[in-house]
Amino acid sequence: MARRALTTTAAAFATTAALLLTACGGGGDSSSDDIKGAGNSSGSPSASASPSAGSEVKRPVIKLPSSFQLTFENWTSSDPVEQAVLNDGKEQLRAGYEAIIENDPESKDRAFYDTKNGFLQSQQWIRTYTDKNLTVIGKLPVFDPKVILSKDKAAASLSYCTDESKASTRNRKTGEVKGNPAGTDPEVLYVISMGKNAQGVWQAVSARSERGGCAK
């Protein structure tokens, strides 16, 4: 899949999809190129234990309701560093949808998996739902992951695709359910720049997205 340069702005989350957010990336490829923008990172830990991603730090337990099924296809790598990126990238995405469903733009779980600047971007995306009293329902597959590591393996680019064809938003007050407008490409490519913090957690530094980018 060809991946051209994408604009790195918080508005990308709000404008590329009428519906949902995910990312597009990472299976097994690595690169010697440095990953721009994914340097040292920081985050605030949550209180509970969590899925293992290759370190001893306690990660938050992310809980999603049965009304929203977020599935990850082929989310494995034989490289342990790439697998750690995949694991934390997966939980970062799950934490974002948890924040939307719980109507919580200040989500500590999401903040755990973001740098400070990354969390500001995440909050803008989350508020595109919470400010409109929207939650998410349905099924959202996440697939075609790809990880590219920097030379020192302290930064990475995680890309992946999502298919929004069976996912919808629901208004918390009226109950109105909406999917994407007719004719909208349901697949969205996401590219997440990530950095490894002092605790060994891979955090999102910034995100880029392109609707229809998965077919390129």
Q: Whereabouts are the PLM-identified features?
A:
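Bacterial N-terminal signal peptides that target proteins for export
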Residues: M1-F13
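Active-site-proximal loop/hinge segments that shape catalytic or ion-binding/gating pockets
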Residues: A17
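C-terminal motif of bacterial Sec signal peptides marking the signal peptidase cleavage site
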Residues: L20-A23
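Bacterial signal peptide processing site
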Residues: G25-G28
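Post-signal peptide N-terminal segment of mature Sec-exported envelope proteins
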Residues: D34-P60
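Core segments of small alpha/beta cavity-forming domains
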Residues: I62-T135
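Structured, amphipathic secondary-structure segments that form assembly/contact surfaces
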Residues: P105-K216
